[in-house]
């Protein structure tokens, strides 16, 4: 059923489980009847011996006839039993293959896609139905756990049945035991993988953690309350520690390496580093970390001054180039009838994160993790290389989503905004543009005459909008991404005098007011005030600057035709009231900061206010479905073993004599002519390798289709 849908595979697996149930009942019944027949044959054998000893030859002949008929019946019964044993092996094998295909789809496709969407959501990509999708995935995990456990029980019961059965010299029972053992081992392997992969980070921590700041995250076990797992894990602690990303990658190669890493590797300290697994009303078995804090991080030390070993120096990373991960783990636990050596050792990793100790590191840390979230695979396969260059189209999607997420703005970047941004990154008048490298995007100066990169410039604008200009941006009062020359031309083409707000491209995190005024002869002259930074706007808000600037008093419109007074009314309560204030309790009278634009005499005010003269450049005033029974409902230690009473019925260990001798020559002839393993009964016992690394190597994530 390769290529079958998930629903088709689920139906097929459910049908196989039901068939295995019926076949188990038939095997149990047939073996019981066969044991009874052997018992009767043994009794008749003893009767014949006794009659022969008593010289009652006429009775011996009659009993031998009865024994011959009984031997024929027993041989036919054994043939039927052997066929049913073969049938259940085939069905268990089919069920295991169906479970393998379903598990591959579930973990390698559905859960993988969910995790990838979760990763992209951290840079603003929409993922509104994340809870619904995860609940649907949990239902599939629970279904697979139930089906696996049922198949496993039928296989274990059959093994116990065969070991109790009379052992004939044909070797068929031993061959069947070998196949059932292989099936059981594969089912256990699938179950271990299913449980371990069901432990996920349902709420990722922030991509950039700050020391001495709390972080919020949540882990969840998607296996839910199946297999009696609740009684093992509810109120069990989930621990968390921070490890280097290099160590996280090592775990993708060596699944067991986490034991050493979690016990010995320490790169930081987390307070409140454990929480209890609890089951909520929605059936989620989860642990929420709401009060954990990263109190210390051990950054790699920079190379010593004058270090001559360039290779060593090059391997050293700045603090903002180092990635980490949170490792979550549960104390190993045992479940059901599995051996003590087969404990569930469950752990999971967060997405890579950055750590900062100071606000000045935020810009560099944000871009490193942004690039990873957008373009890297969620698989920590050490054989895959990092994406170092992408097309502008992919970069534009990333910027648009990150902008909305970071600023919280309702108004997204428009196509014209992105076109303006592309001019900062692409070579002018070149048709065949090369991919944009991370270095060009985040490290290289935006222009030769500027000391900052494109990302530093864009990041500072996002900070400015978030902290000071969000209302201006959302209402469309801030044009923002437009060049000084284009702003001047646009304003001069308006029928009436106007002003606009644009972001400086020669200074980081600054907004400039551009305006056009008319001379007495009707000539329009554009002016651009020196840009205001966040620090400037802390001293006097942008709305107050616009309201108090003499040169803007007679300009009624913001470009293109927005009533200035309508805009200012939005800020009257929070700005003008704050500036006006009331009487001071100390007796002082309050003062007011007023912004004045120095237009160098090129503009004669139409009002009686005096002209303002000064420097050549205007400047701001301030500084810058299942069976009726479910194996998952039974949790005894010997849930896979038969009762003693049933075992006694099906066991012939105390039977004396050779079984083949009891069955007679007719049995041998029948068995010789019957081959339960001919070409019509061959079945495939080759299973998909569900190792973690192999699962993840099926996918190489691309942020956007090429």
From Swiss-Prot:
Domain spans labelled SH2: 477-574
Family: Belongs to the transcription factor STAT family.
Coiled coil: none
Function as written in the Swiss-Prot or TrEMBL entry: Carries out a dual function: signal transduction and activation of transcription. Activated STAT proteins play a role in repression of dauer formation. Neuronal expression is held in check by negative signals through the TGF-beta pathway that target the daf-3 transcription factor.
Tissue: Expressed in adult and larval pharynx, head ganglia, tail ganglia, ventral nerve cord and body muscles.
Gene3D superfamilies documented for this protein: EF-hand (1.10.238.10), SH2 domain (3.30.505.10), STAT transcription factor, all-alpha domain (1.20.1050.20), STAT transcription factor, DNA-binding domain (2.60.40.630)
Subunit and partners: Forms a homodimer or a heterodimer with a related family member.
Full protein name: Signal transducer and activator of transcription 1
InterPro entries attached to this UniProt entry: p53-like_TF_DNA-bd_sf, SH2, SH2_dom_sf, STAT, STAT_linker, STAT_TF_alpha, STAT_TF_coiled-coil, STAT_TF_DNA-bd
Top-rank taxon, per record: Eukaryota
GO cellular component, as recorded: cytoplasm; nucleus
UniProt keyword Oxidoreductase present: no
Molecular function GO terms recorded: DNA-binding transcription factor activity, RNA polymerase II-specific; RNA polymerase II cis-regulatory region sequence-specific DNA binding; sequence-specific DNA binding
Keyword DNA-binding: yes
Gene Ontology biological process terms from the UniProt entry: cell surface receptor signaling pathway via JAK-STAT; dauer larval development; defense response; positive regulation of transcription by RNA polymerase II; regulation of cell population proliferation; regulation of transcription by RNA polymerase II
Protein encoded by which gene: sta-1
CDD domains named among the record's database cross-references: SH2_STAT_family (cd09919), STAT_CCD (cd14786), STAT_DBD (cd14801)
Cysteines joined through disulfide linkages: none
Location relative to the cell: Cytoplasm; Nucleus
Keyword annotations from UniProtKB, A to Z: Activator, Cytoplasm, Developmental protein, DNA-binding, Nucleus, Phosphoprotein, SH2 domain, Transcription, Transcription regulation
């Amino acid at each position: 059923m390769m290529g079958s849908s998930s629903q088709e595979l689920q139906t097929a697996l459910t049908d196989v489980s039901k068939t295995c149930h019926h076949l188990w009942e038939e095997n149990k019944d047939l073996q019981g009847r066969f044991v009874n027949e052997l018992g009767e044959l043994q009794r008749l054998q003893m009767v014949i011996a006794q009659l022969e000893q008593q010289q009652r030859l006429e009775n011996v002949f009659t009993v031998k006839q009865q024994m011959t008929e009984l031997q024929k019946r027993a041989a036919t019964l054994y043939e039927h039993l052997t066929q049913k044993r073969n049938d259940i092996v085939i069905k268990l094998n089919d069920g295991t293959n169906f479970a393998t295909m379903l598990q591959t789809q579930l973990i390698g496709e559905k859960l993988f896609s969910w995790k990838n969407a979760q990763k992209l959501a951290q840079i603003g990509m929409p993922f509104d139905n994340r809870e619904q999708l995860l609940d649907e995935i949990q239902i599939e995990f629970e279904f697979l756990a139930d089906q696996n456990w049922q198949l496993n029980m039928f296989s274990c019961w059959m093994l116990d049945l065969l070991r109790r059965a009379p052992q004939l010299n044909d070797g068929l029972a031993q061959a069947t035991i070998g196949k059932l053992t292989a099936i059981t081992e594969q089912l256990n392997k699938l179950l271990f993988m299913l449980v371990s992969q069901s432990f996920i980070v349902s709420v990722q921590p922030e991509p950039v953690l700050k020391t001495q700041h709390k972080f919020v995250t949540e882990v969840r076990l998607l296996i839910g309350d199946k297999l009696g797992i609740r009684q093992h894990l509810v109120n069990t602690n989930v621990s968390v520690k921070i490890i280097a990303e290099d160590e996280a990658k090592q775990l993708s190669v060596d699944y067991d390496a986490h034991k050493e890493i979690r016990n010995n590797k320490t790169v930081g300290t987390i307070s409140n580093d454990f929480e209890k697994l609890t089951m909520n009303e929605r059936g989620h078995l989860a642990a929420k970390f709401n009060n954990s804090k990263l109190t210390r991080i051990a950054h790699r030390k920079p190379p010593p001054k004058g270090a001559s070993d360039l290779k060593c120096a090059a391997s050293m990373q700045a603090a903002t180039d180092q990635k980490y991960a949170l490792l979550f783990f549960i104390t190993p636990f045992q479940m059901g009838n599995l051996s003590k050596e087969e404990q569930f050792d469950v752990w999971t990793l967060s997405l890579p994160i950055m750590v900062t100790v100071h606000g000045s590191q935020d810009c560099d840390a944000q871009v490193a993790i942004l690039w990873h979230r957008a373009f890297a695979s969620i698989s920590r396969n050490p054989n895959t290389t990092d994406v170092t260059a992408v097309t502008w189209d992919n970069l534009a999607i990333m910027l648009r989503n990150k902008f909305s997420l970071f600023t919280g703005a309702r108004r997204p970047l428009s196509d014209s905004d992105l076109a303006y941004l592309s001019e900062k990154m692409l070579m002018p008048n070149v048709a065949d543009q090369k991919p944009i490298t991370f270095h060009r995007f985040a490290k290289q100066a935006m222009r030769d005459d500027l000391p900052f990169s494109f990302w530093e410039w864009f990041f500072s604008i996002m900070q400015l909008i978030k902290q000071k200009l969000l209302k201006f941006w959302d209402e469309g009062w801030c044009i923002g991404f437009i060049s000084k020359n284009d702003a001047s031309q646009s304003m001069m083409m308006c029928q009436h005098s106007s002003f606009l707000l644009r972001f400086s491209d020669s200074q980081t995190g600054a907004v400039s007011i551009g305006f056009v005024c008319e001379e007495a002869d009707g000539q329009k002259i554009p002016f651009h005030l020196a840009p205001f930074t966040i620090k400037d706007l802390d001293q006097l808000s942008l709305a107050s600057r616009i309201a108090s600037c003499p040169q803007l008093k007679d300009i009624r419109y913001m470009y293109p035709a927005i009533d200035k007074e309508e805009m200012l009314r939005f800020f009257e309560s929070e700005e003008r009231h704050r500036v006006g204030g009331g009487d001071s309790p100390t007796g002082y009278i309050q003062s007011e900061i007023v912004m004045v634009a120095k237009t160098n005499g090129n503009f004669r005010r139409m009002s009686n206010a005096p002209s303002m003269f000064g420097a050549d450049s205007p400047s701001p005033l301030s500084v810058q479905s299942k069976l009726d029974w479910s194996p998952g409902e039974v949790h005894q230690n010997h849930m896979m073993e038969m009762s003693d009473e049933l075992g006694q019925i099906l066991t012939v260990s105390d039977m004396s004599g050779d079984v083949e001798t009891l069955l007679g020559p007719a049995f041998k002839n029948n068995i010789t002519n019957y081959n339960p393993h001919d070409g019509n009964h061959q079945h495939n016992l080759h299973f998909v390798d569900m190792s973690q690394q192999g699962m993840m190597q099926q996918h190489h994530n691309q942020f956007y289709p090429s």
